[in-house]
Amino acid sequence: MSSTWSPTVRRRMFCLLLAGGLTLGVAACGSGSGESTGGKVKITVTGQPPTSQPFERGVFDADVKEFEESHPDIDIEPHEGFMDPKTFSAKLAGGQLEDVYYVYFTDPAQIIARRQAADITEAAKGLKNFGDIKPELLDNFRDADGKLYGLPTMNYSMGLVYSRPLFQKAGLDPNKPPQTWDEVRAAAKKIAALGNGTVGYADYSKNNQGGWHLTAWLYSMGSEVARKDGDKWVAAFDNDKAKAALNQLRAMRWEDDTMGSKQLLEAQDVQRMMGAGQLGMYMAAPDNVPVLVKQFNGKYEDYGVAGMPGGQGTLLGGEGYMINPKASPEKIKAGLEWVRWKYLNPERFEKHVQQYVDGKQPVGLPAEPTPDVWQGAVRDQQLAIKAKHANVPAENYQSYVDSSSRIKGSIEPPNAQQVYAILDSVMQAVLTDRNANIDQQLSSAVSKVNSVLAQVK
């Protein structure tokens, strides 16, 4: 990986920069390359990893070749840049938007409202294994009438990443991670008591990452950040649950002194602490674990991932693909078949996992190459293949896997990045000012968030 951030955090930065770029109407969307070449349907697709990620690029290019061999009537023209905010808006404005394009889970609602994606409701019905995809993920790509505009290919939910060695040193059972925030607080006390600068629990509080994590905290307590009130969105976090979350954070920071003195942290700061063996726990998705190993000299066996403490909810995110609204029926059909074959294909589970094993990449995490987008028998099939080929201690993440089916996941609020910027200030106040007035912080944030939500169309 070329970045010290996990894919989850890199997607956050992409969305932050993209937030102002999805404001163009359907007239700005082109149809990509020509309709056909030599009798073939030619489609342009995003998702090709950059050359700085040689393993991922190699897998993608090999998949394109295999797909074209098995689908001689379809010609794939792959494009890099699916995470490049510098080109996304320009492509929309210049009519160069690909036929099949990547989106983050926060994007579909606005894209659909602005008619920047094709209606694939009927075309998707014939896709193999369509009924095995988790319906709550598909719902993220539907409009108010239930019409479908995209397919999910990867998802994550926030949980708790923790240091198994520090748990053991502190007399805690690493196979029984905290399930409530009170248990997190108690564990943080024992870990911080180890001394030598050891921090029990850390959290983000700048560059919108603080607001992102505060949203996850609120979900875990059973609160919302925004709710629909008739035809408009309104803030929904000036409540006792939000106050309880912030009071818990304040208590850990100031009463317990388990969060360290250095604050205004972001992802790479916290990952560096965990990789150095100086941090007990932090909130994150499972894709953080490979980053800790590859970029911060960690070991897979040293980390566990638990479900979101509190169990009343968690932040759900992910990615998927949508189709250019000007694409012909032939291109829509070809594009959906590419997405299904490449990303949503149980028949290729074993081969895809083997690609990772052969490339000495981690297998066993609840993340790529086995994204948790399936339900029922197909999910069981995927879990069995993952267990068969696991080259990392999958049992360390079992708590997270077990909780994923019972903890409700909620996607991010509308205009998420603007909301997060406001909530950053709340996190910063609580973590840097012992006397911060939580009621005032929430009241002020609600007023500002309502102004942001009023812009949602």
Question: For each of these PLM feature ranges, what is it?
Answer:
Residues S2-T8, R12-Q110, K128, P174, ...:
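Conserved N-terminal structural module of periplasmic/extracytoplasmic solute-binding proteins
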